[in-house]
Amino acid sequence: MDCRIIAQSVKIYSFTEGRQLHIKENMTFLKRFAKSPRKIGSVTPSSKFLTKAMLDRVDWENAKYIAELGAGTGVFTREIVKRARPDAKILVFEIDPALQKLIREEHPNHMGLTLHSDAQELYRYMNENGIEQLDFVISSLPFTVLPPRMTVRILNAVVKCLKPEGHFVAYQYSSIMKHVLKKKFSHMKTRFVMLNVPPAFVYDCWR
């Protein structure tokens, strides 16, 4: 895939948000997308509108244990750190080493944040960090392009790890996953965010 074409899309996208995006962050994102589009799942980082739609679903006052799946360049991570309680534990999962590096460099001294690679191992990393159950799981994973067995394993791990009143908040670029999520969760609220590239469905799921 031609990074010049992608870069032009991001340039246009940045002006629709009314600001210039961080050059290093976005060029890294573009390169990783061009190399592994199935892993990255999107041509651009999430917009501020999608970020707000996702993270406004979280009860920040009471959320002490949070996991983020598929952190990318850390757009959500950055806002999670801002909003979270001082004593919150945040498990951040990102499989791409270059994107992991960006997140690690941005949050070198956050004592409650730990960085991991494989979201399928969510339960193991919770145990390692002294967490019994999670209050919220925030997901940017591109489930529709992941191997089906991997998607099942990740969703099973999420259901297992959430508190009974916990929420799974995820976005997707199509409604394909809606019926899958309905099989895992008893309740769901859906929101469509037009101001994102591409537009996205936000699913807030709980049991």
Task: Give residue ranges: language-model regions.
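Class I SAM-dependent methyltransferase Rossmann-like catalytic core
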Residues: 25-58
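Conserved class I S-adenosyl-L-methionine
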Residues: 63-72
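Conserved SAM-binding loop of SAM-dependent methyltransferases across substrates and taxa
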Residues: 73-85
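Conserved SAM/SAH-binding beta-strand->alpha-helix loop
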Residues: 96
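S-adenosyl-L-methionine
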Residues: 99-128
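A short glycine-rich, Lys/Arg-flanked "PGG" loop and its adjoining helix->strand segment in the class I
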Residues: 152-164
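Conserved beta-strand signature within the Rossmann-like core of class I S-adenosyl-L-methionine
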Residues: 165-172
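Core SAM-dependent methyltransferase catalytic element
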Residues: 193-207
